[in-house]
Structure formats: structure tokens, C-alpha cells
């Protein structure tokens, strides 16, 4: 039940109603509210526990309540923190952070810096019930419940007010039976180291801007927070891979690409146009770290060959290679197999136009490598992969500005589908659900390719009706001297 008496009988998740049965809907809602109130009236302990589960919503409805944003961990560790507030402007702004920390996502330039105290209590006293409002009595009751350590922090909070009136903030967390902690607060004035009762108090609540909370609430894996993944090649496909890994919860990314972001890629790259002319890795670091709280990105504006030659792979949990250059990718596949460190490597590339995309997972020291794909039906080495959708020796590149502007035609949809597929394959390897070689692909309808007279392989026709298990066996089924010691 809210401060104003509203009763919530359903959270709305999965609720389906027939809008033509209005009387039945009203009757059902009223009966549900009655049953809920009757239930809590007979069990005071359970009612109190349920109320504390919903404390933040109740507090937010108190008269004069202001909602701020918290960037510190609500971990039950009593401490002095910092508050930044402005209740006089057109829109009230309040932020809370640990001392010495100025979160980059908050604009604090025009806000007053205030002293604040965060404490944790097992029970919250003095909660006002309608029609009563929050008063200084609440602070008195909280103060009476403080431990000796908390009381010392309280005195330290008020100490600067000995010479002038100061605005202070008290934030209190209490346990929720449903898990976690509720956080509420109050802003008040102090003078001569005492609460100034001439200045009204007002309630505070806070949106949680901590990386841990937003990750868990937003569906990002906390298990992946410690994982470190390198993405080699940050073009249209590689940038989608990086963005998807970050959104899934991977906490550390290493981005390697020597090129600048070009206006030619605006419609198929995750970067915004404001980054045109900047190194792609630097721009992605800037954009992704601001997009995904808690993410740490290492950006290398160098060639992948140079990076690999100077960087030990120990400490890296996975690598995604998104060059779209088969010869270069094969050389990297061999380089990874020569390393002592075992790790999963995903190679991903696009076919021209709307034919489809591919993603291959290999492990550095296990059977199955990129060279396995470069075998003909007899098992002999060949120049083109068995997985190709396009027959070899066809001209598919275009250029609009001369030789320097040559590109392979494909669109944003194709790049995103391929990038998501490769990222999903890497995520499976990181969490242990994919522990062996694997080949994944998607097949487009080929309308554009056929309109341009391009010839497709028999595999492109068979692929839609072939399971990924069978496709993986076919892709890696030929003898390979690189990964299995025979030819």
C-alpha cells in the first residue's frame, strides 16, 4: 500500500485482460485488494516485511519527496559520503557518491557540494503514515537507534555546522526480505552541531546508478564482469561484436584496429557520425565506456599483427577476429595455435550483399582450426573455404571514389546479424557451454546477389536445411595437418 492509500494487487507482468468485461475486471480487482489487506492484517510480522520490501516506493510518495541518483554501493558499510544538490533550480537535482569520487555521468558543475552520511539499520523507526509528513522527529528516532560507531559518524557529519547553518543529507538502508536493501534519505539543516528545527526536512530517494545494480537489473551477466576479451578488427562486424559483448556483461574489452572511422561506414557501424576521422578503437572506447557502466576498454590504434607480436595472451579469456580477410585470418589462426595459452578464438566474416555470414569457434590447443575449412572434398588444401556461399573468382567489390574507396557491398542488417552470431558464440565459450570447435552461419535470401548475376555454391542452397551439428562435422571433417597431425 502506498502513502496515499493505493493498493497494488498485481505487478502487471504477463497480465492479460478482456477490455469488454469491465464489471468483472473491477470486481476481481476489488476482491484482490480486500484479500491482500485481510492477509496482512492477520500477520503483523509478514505485513511489516512486505512493507519494507516496498519502502522506497512508499518513501517516494511522501509529501515533498525528491528523487536523486546514487553512484555508491549500498553495501551496508557505514560511512561519510558526498551529496550534490540544487533544489532551487527549475528541476531539482540531487546526486550521491563516495567521497572523492565525481562520477563522469553526473553534471555536478553547478551543484552545491554537501556533506552526507550513509548508514545501515536493521529496522527503520519513525516512518510517517498518512496524513502525517516527515518531520525532525524522524531524525531523532534514527539517532536514538545508532550504534556507537554510527553515532561518531553522525557527530562528524554535523561538526562543520558549528559556525553556520549547513544542509546535510542522511541516507539509510534497511534489509529487504525479498533480497537486497532499500535506500531512503532525508535532507535537513544543522547549526551549532545540532539539527536546525527552523528549517523543514524533506524526504529523498535515489535511482541506483551503480554498475553492479544496473548490470543485474539490465540482464548483463555478473559472471562475465571479470572476463577479458580481445576484438581484432573493429569495422562494421567487429564493432557489433564489441558492443554485444559489453551489453552481455563482459567487463574488459581489448580493441585492436589501425584504421580511422570513415564516413563510408556510418550506416553499418555502431559508432555515431561525430567520431568520423577518429581512430575506431579510441572512439569505441569513448562510446562504450559511457554506454555500459563498469566496462573497461583498452584501445590499440595499431595493426593486429603488431599487437599480437607484443602482447602475451595470458590473462585474456577469448579473442574474436573480424577482419573479413581470409588470408590474414588463417595466419592468425596458426599464430594462436603456436601460443602456450589455451583460449577460445572466434573468426567471423560476411558474404557479399545478402548471401549470409559465418562464425567459427576454435580452441588454440584442440582439434579444429580455420585451416580445416580450406580443404576440398578429397581433403587436399584449397584457396577457398568449404563454407563459402559464393563461387570463387567473381568480382564483388565496388568503389565510388577510386581505388582507395574499394569496399565489399553489404548492409547494416547483415553486419549486425553476423556480429551478434559471433558474439553469442564467444559468450558460450566464456561461460563454458561451448567447449569444442563449432561452425555457425546464417543464410540470406540472396535476392541482391542473384540480381547481379553472382553464382552461389551448392552449400548456400543446402545450408538452410542443414543443422549446425552436421555443418560443423562437414566443416571440420577433413584431415588437417595443422590441428590433428595428419594430411
Where in the sequence are the language-model features?
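Compact alpha/beta protein-protein interaction domains typified by the UBC
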Residues: 1-10, 24
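Ser/Thr/Pro-rich, low-complexity mucin-like regions
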Residues: 29-46
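Glycine-rich phosphate/adenylate-binding loop
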Residues: 48-192, 314-318, 322-487
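N-terminal charged helix/coil linker that caps or initiates catalytic domains
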Residues: 178-229
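Glycine-rich adenosine-cofactor-binding loop
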Residues: 218-260
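Glycine-rich phosphate-binding loop and adjoining beta1-alpha1-beta2 segment
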Residues: 258-293
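S-adenosyl-L-methionine
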Residues: 290-308
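Short amphipathic alpha-helix with an adjacent loop that forms part of the alpha/beta core around
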Residues: 307-315
Amino acid at each position: 500500500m502506498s502513502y496515499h492509500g493505493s493498493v497494488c494487487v498485481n505487478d502487471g507482468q504477463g497480465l492479460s485482460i478482456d477490455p469488454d468485461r469491465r464489471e468483472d475486471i473491477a470486481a476481481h480487482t476489488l476482491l484482490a485488494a480486500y484479500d491482500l489487506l485481510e492477509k496482512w492484517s492477520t500477520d503483523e510480522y509478514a505485513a511489516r516485511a512486505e512493507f519494507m520490501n516496498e519502502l522506497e516506493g512508499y518513501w517516494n510518495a511522501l509529501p515533498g519527496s525528491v528523487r536523486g541518483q546514487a553512484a555508491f554501493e549500498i553495501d551496508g558499510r557505514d560511512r561519510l559520503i558526498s551529496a550534490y544538490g540544487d533544489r532551487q533550480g527549475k528541476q531539482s537535482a540531487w546526486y550521491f557518491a563516495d567521497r572523492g569520487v565525481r562520477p563522469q555521468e553526473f553534471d555536478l558543475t553547478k551543484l552545491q557540494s554537501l556533506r552526507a552520511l550513509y548508514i545501515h539499520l536493521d529496522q527503520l523507526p519513525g516512518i510517517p503514515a498518512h496524513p502525517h509528513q516527515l518531520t525532525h522527529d524522524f531524525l531523532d528516532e534514527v539517532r536514538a537507534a545508532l550504534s556507537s560507531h554510527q553515532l561518531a559518524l553522525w557527530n562528524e557529519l554535523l561538526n562543520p555546522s558549528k559556525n553556520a547553518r549547513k544542509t546535510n543529507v542522511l541516507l539509510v538502508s534497511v534489509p529487504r526480505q525479498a533480497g537486497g536493501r532499500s535506500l531512503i534519505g532525508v535532507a535537513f539543516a544543522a547549526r551549532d552541531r545540532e539539527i536546525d528545527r527552523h528549517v523543514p526536512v524533506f524526504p529523498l530517494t535515489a535511482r541506483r546508478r551503480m554498475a553492479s545494480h544496473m548490470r543485474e537489473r539490465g540482464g548483463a551477466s555478473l559472471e562475465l564482469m571479470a572476463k577479458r576479451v580481445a576484438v581484432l578488427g573493429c569495422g562494421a562486424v567487429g564493432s557489433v561484436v564489441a558492443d554485444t559483448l559489453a551489453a552481455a556483461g563482459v567487463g574488459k574489452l581489448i580493441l585492436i584496429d589501425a584504421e580511422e572511422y570513415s564516413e563510408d561506414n556510418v550506416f553499418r557501424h555502431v559508432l555515431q557520425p561525430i567520431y568520423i576521422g577518429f581512430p575506431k578503437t579510441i572512439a569505441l572506447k569513448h562510446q562504450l565506456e559511457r554506454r555500459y557502466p563498469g566496462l573497461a576498454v583498452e584501445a590499440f590504434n595499431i595493426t593486429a599483427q603488431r599487437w599480437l607480436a607484443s602482447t602475451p595472451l595470458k590473462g585474456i579469456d577469448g579473442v574474436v577476429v573480424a577482419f573479413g580477410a581470409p588470408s590474414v585470418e588463417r595466419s592468425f589462426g596458426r599464430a594462436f595455435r603456436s601460443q602456450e595459452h589455451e583460449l577460445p578464438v572466434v573468426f567471423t566474416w560476411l558474404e557479399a550483399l545478402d548471401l549470409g555470414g559465418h562464425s567459427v569457434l576454435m580452441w588454440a590447443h584442440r582439434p579444429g582450426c580455420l585451416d580445416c575449412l580450406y580443404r576440398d572434398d578429397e581433403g587436399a588444401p584449397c584457396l577457398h573455404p568449404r563454407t563459402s556461399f559464393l563461387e570463387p573468382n567473381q568480382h564483388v567489390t565496388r568503389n565510388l571514389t577510386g581505388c582507395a574507396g574499394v569496399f565489399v557491398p553489404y548492409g547494416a542488417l547483415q553486419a549486425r546479424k553476423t556480429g551478434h552470431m559471433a558474439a553469442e558464440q564467444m559468450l558460450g565459450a566464456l561461460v563454458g557451454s561451448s567447449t569444442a570447435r563449432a561452425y555457425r552461419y546464417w543464410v540470406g535470401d540472396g535476392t541482391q546477389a542473384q540480381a547481379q548475376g553472382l553464382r552461389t555454391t551448392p552449400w548456400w542452397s543446402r545450408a538452410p536445411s542443414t543443422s549446425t551439428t552436421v555443418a560443423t562435422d562437414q566443416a571440420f571433417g577433413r584431415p588437417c595437418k595443422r590441428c590433428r597431425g595428419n594430411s
